Amino acid sequence: LAFFVIVSASIELGTLPITSSVADNTDTFGLVIPILFFSLMALNYVAVEMLDLDVNEMMRQQIESKGSNRVLFENLLSFLVFLAGLLLWVKYVHKQPIKTLTTSREKVDLSRFWFAFALVAIFNIGITVLDYYSNPQDYVFNFQWEPFLYLLLISVFLIPIQTSFEEYFFRGYLMQGIGVLAKNRWIPLVLTSVIFGGLHYFNPEVTKLGNIIMIYYIGTGFMLGIMTLMDEGMELALGFHAANNL
């Protein structure tokens, strides 16, 4: 049902800003992005289940052969393609400026982004420092300059791209489309939040910590969605998500 609503909403999103030259093909245009994304997710899941693949073991072997930084780089690089594809699709197919996908304000408010980023970064650093002094036995000092610098570069440049894609796709593209179809804010908030959290079900930590961790992921989706709707823009959500993942 959620997939049907998302597809329908994407079609609806396409009907608003598209010019008459492509309006006759709106159905096709509206279907492409959600079908491609969710088909990739479904194909990945089916392949893992049918081939009985041990994803954690495969990841461990890749890290042993390539190194953790290279594996992280390769995994994050795909989000650069996803983000560029989504933004180009919105700009040239839906004929919408990227600003309208980002905010309802006259221009993107970067101060909001940096406020949320700084707030979350300071909180996370503070919690980590507090935990370090409270439980020093849980930490091992293993600082190495070269791997650290590579990790720093990868994180600073690619993790914000990963989080930006997720925000633009869920809180931008899908939330706007579902909102147009549903004509209210609750349905897009609930659907995008649950699906956003649900996609994290395949993360390795879910296997280790159990399904209870899904409350955190879905709850985070709700919080980011509420931020976007109440502030009428994605700047706060973009800053929060980037700092949280970093």
Predicted regions and their residues:
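Alpha-helical membrane-inserting segments
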Residues: 6-10, 39-47, 81, 85, ...
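Juxtamembrane helix-loop-helix connectors linking adjacent transmembrane helices
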Residues: 58-69, 74-76, 98-165, 175-176, ...
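N-terminal, membrane-interfacial amphipathic/helix-forming hydrophobic leader that caps
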Residues: 1-97
